[in-house]
Structures are given as structure tokens and as C-alpha cells.
Amino acid sequence: MVTAIVLIDVEADRIPEAAQQIADLPGVDQVYSCAGDVDLVAITRVADHEAIAELVPGHISKVPGVLRTVTHIAFREYSQRDEDDAFSIGMQS
């Protein structure tokens, strides 16, 4: 499984529609609109690098209003849930 974080610049008047279209794409797990340097952040989870190579330029970049994407590939996931699981070994709930 490959997780990628895709930063997306979108024409201002098309952000809601673009966000929904991107969210509906297979492999896109979450889409956030945000303040800052980019308009949308998409969290993607796909089978392999070939799939992310298809998803971003082949689908996300072609959504009407999308101007630019920057993709970051995740190496490892660190989350509170992982920490909680690690420290609860042998403890009863």
C-alpha cells in the first residue's frame, strides 16, 4: 500500500466542485480544503507506485479547475493510535 499526500492548487471559484470530484476518485481517501499555500490536500492510498503515477497525472490533474499538484510519498505512518496500541500490550481494557 502506498500513501501519498497531494497538494493541489485550484481556481478559486472551482474549489468545492474540484474537491468533490477528487474525493470521488478511486484511491483518494480524504480531501481537505485549507488555508495557506495550497487550496486542497488529498490523502491517497493505492496498491503501488504505478497506481499513484496513474492517479495524480491521469485523474487528479485533469479535474476541471486544477492548476497544479505536488505529490509527497509517505515512507511510514506515525499516529496516536499506533502509540496507544504499542503501550497497551498486555493491559486489559
What are these regions (language model features)?
Residues M1-S93:
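A compositional/biophysical signature of low hydrophobicity enriched in polar/charged and small residues
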